């Protein structure tokens, strides 16, 4: 099965026509799907679509944006088992853990949908006569979201849903290793009623990532991944004064003291090393 990019409400191949294979790591003979192998021109079109959609999406009342996201949470909840099984097939976590990954996306989407009615500003007394001082919350614009393979539905939800409920638009670049989970997530948003161009999906490598972090029409960059790539993202975005969020790789030390419960401590060590295929930073 071929899965294209999602740009301006349409599922389309990459401009180059190239594809990426996604295979089951536990059975490399099992081809999960073929995905668009995108170039900078694909990312350019996605950013343009997001910029255009922003002009109308930002004007949709926040409670109405939230209603769309609430519907998305309901759809994911109904299809949780399907999404979890596909996630296990494409990236290797055991089914119990991929169910948890999908559940995080459900919980985050429900929680952030409620923020549609909590985007409060502030009022303050003014030192000037006949003046009224207040602050309001406003969206920032186009947001680039670059996500890793280890939590392929939870992490996109953490980034995309807050951006959408606040009136921003999004271009998502998932890991090339786990694009199917992101395709599922974006299709859910499409089904829930997110307008064309508000969410865009581009699967690809460094050329896509570079444009998403340097393009002048991108206001926010949110990246989760390795420290080396995170440094590069920051270097790319800094000259343009973009707002940048980085969550980078970490190795958590475990110190076992003399009075520790050894059985409990060893259980923690083993879980930390092998739980969630050893890719949880806890």
Segments from the language model and where they lie:
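ALDH superfamily catalytic-core signature
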Residues: 228-281
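Conserved small-residue-rich beta-alpha loop and adjacent elements
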Residues: 122-196
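Glycine-rich loop-to-alpha-helix module at the N-terminal edge of alpha/beta enzyme cores
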Residues: 23, 28-119, 130
């Amino acid at each position: 099965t071929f899965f294209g990019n999602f740009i301006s409400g349409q599922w389309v191949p990459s401009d180059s026509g190239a594809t990426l294979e996604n295979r089951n790591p536990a059975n490399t003979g099992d081809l999960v799907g073929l995905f668009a192998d995108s170039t900078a021109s694909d990312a350019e079109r996605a950013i343009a679509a997001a910029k255009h959609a922003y002009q109308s999406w930002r004007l949709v009342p926040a409670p109405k944006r939230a209603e769309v996201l609430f519907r998305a949470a309901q759809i994911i909840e109904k299809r949780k088992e399907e999404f979890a099984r596909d996630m296990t097939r494409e990236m290797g976590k055991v089914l119990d853990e991929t169910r948890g990954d999908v559940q995080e996306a459900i919980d985050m989407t429900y929680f952030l949908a409620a923020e549609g009615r909590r985007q409060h500003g502030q009022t303050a007394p003014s030192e000037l006569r006949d003046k009224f001082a207040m602050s309001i919350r406003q969206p920032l614009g186009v947001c680039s979201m670059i996500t890793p393979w280890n939590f392929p539905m939870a992490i996109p939800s953490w980034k995309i849903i807050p951006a959408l409920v606040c009136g921003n638009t999004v271009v998502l670049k998932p890991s090339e290793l786990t694009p199917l989970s992101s395709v599922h997530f974006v299709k859910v948003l499409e089904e829930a009623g997110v307008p064309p161009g508000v969410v865009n999906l581009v699967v690809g490598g460094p050329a896509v990532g570079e444009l998403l972090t340097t393009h002048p029409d991108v206001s926010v960059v949110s990246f989760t991944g390795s420290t080396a790539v995170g440094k590069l993202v920051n270097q790319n975005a800094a000259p343009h004064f973009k707002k940048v969020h980085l969550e980078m790789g970490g190795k958590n030390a475990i110190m076992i003291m003399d009075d520790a419960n050894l059985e409990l401590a060893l259980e923690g060590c083993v879980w930390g090393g092998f739980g969630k295929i050893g890719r949880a930073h806890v």
